[in-house]
Amino acid sequence: MIGYSMFYFVRKNFSFAIPLLNQEYGISNASFGIIMTIGGLIYGVSKFVNGILADRTNARWHLVIGLSVCVLTSILFGFADRISMFFTGSGQDGDFIRGMVIVMGVLYMINQIFQGCGFAPCNHLMVSWVPPREMATKMSIWNTSHSVGAFVVAVICGYITRWQLCFWVPAMIAFVGIFFIILSLRDTPKSVGLPELPKVKGELDDNQQKDPKAFRHFLIKKVFLNPVIWVLAVTDLFVYIVRFAILAWGPSMLSGMGLSKELTGWTVAVFEIAGCAGMLCAGYISDKFFKSRSQRVCAVEMALVAVCLVGLHFLQDADMPIMFLILLALAGFLIYGPQALLGVTAANIATKRAASSAVGLIGLMSYLSTIITGFGFGALADKFGGWGWIFITMGAIAAVGTVLILSVWNLKEGNID
């Protein structure tokens, strides 16, 4: 949990620097949207590639390498103005601004490549240490690292008035996290002298796992030609459109409503706190009442998310900030359940030998969402001068996701008795 939350420290800080950069240099939302769109696509591909790698590499060092590079890029982000000035020879004109956008774009791309080293190794660790019948609950607990990281960053950056410090302060905290991972994390039960989890039907043994041909055949069958995995992947795409739209543009949306920077930070933090509670409840309900059929919990929550988003559309201009905050928190509570449990369902279907690959494929699809949440929503906000109909769009997307996940309502995960 702590290790993956560190990745969020040097990832979600970018969103809180955007209003400050916009205010100081006049960089448009569309420019930042393009950066986030391309970066999100790169992250999706990286998550997919690292998912395959994580099934065959040491998870601890995989995490350490990725986090180290992300910390370095976050530090360099704070010097973007000086780097641009070095190449353009100016500190204020159009060339300088364009140079800053290019510098931040390049650094963001590098950051996103190595952000992909975070989720897949953690998923590999979970399926290596946790039996399938406990996976929804335990994975939901681990998934709170998303919200913990984003919550702490939101609070810290909410009180920072210089955009450079939005990058440097979280980077220093994540730097300490690197040493925590090295000292405390181990790859598999076998690496510390404990017995491995029992194998399940259809799973590769250790020798087959090392055989490239056998592993490739298993991967194609369990992941790439599995229609259920693709249903889960497309549903996760819709989940991430909603989640990322609020995380990426939340500070800008709330600033546009007239909220102070401090209150904006706390409002986004409340979304994350509610998400934490939602993940824990969803995992417990899935294992306790639905016999680990997580997709059923996802369907109910997605439908309720759609209702919340339509409500946010009507509240944003109603001068009712408390009601807006309550509904935003409820949306966070609900959307983080599917965000955690769709991966659990995919991992159980693919078995622990290909779980990271399955989750990597879902990750690739989910980060296609940045085409809409990044450039698409940013350009719409610039054109229409507000975020009103974006909430309606997100509500419609959540409704489509509900219909899609209902198609696998009766699914029984492949390795659950």
Language-model segments: what does each one mean?
Residues S68-F96, A303-D317:
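C-terminal ends and interior cores of transmembrane alpha-helices
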Residues W142-K190:
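Helix-loop-helix hairpin linking two adjacent transmembrane segments in secondary transporters
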Residues F14-I18, N226-L280, Q339, T373-G374:
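Extracytoplasmic gate region of multi-pass secondary transporters
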Residues T73, F87-C117, P321-G337:
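Hydrophobic core of transmembrane alpha-helices in multi-pass small-molecule transporters
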Residues S292-L342:
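C-terminal transmembrane helical hairpin of 12-TM major facilitator-type secondary transporters
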Residues R56-L67, K288-M302:
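Cytoplasmic membrane-interface "Motif A"-like loop-to-helix N-cap segments
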Residues M104-H146:
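Cytoplasmic helix-loop-helix junction between adjacent transmembrane helices
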Residues K12, G40-F48, A150-F151, E272-L280, ...:
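Residue-level signature of mid-helix packing/kink "hotspots" within the transmembrane helices
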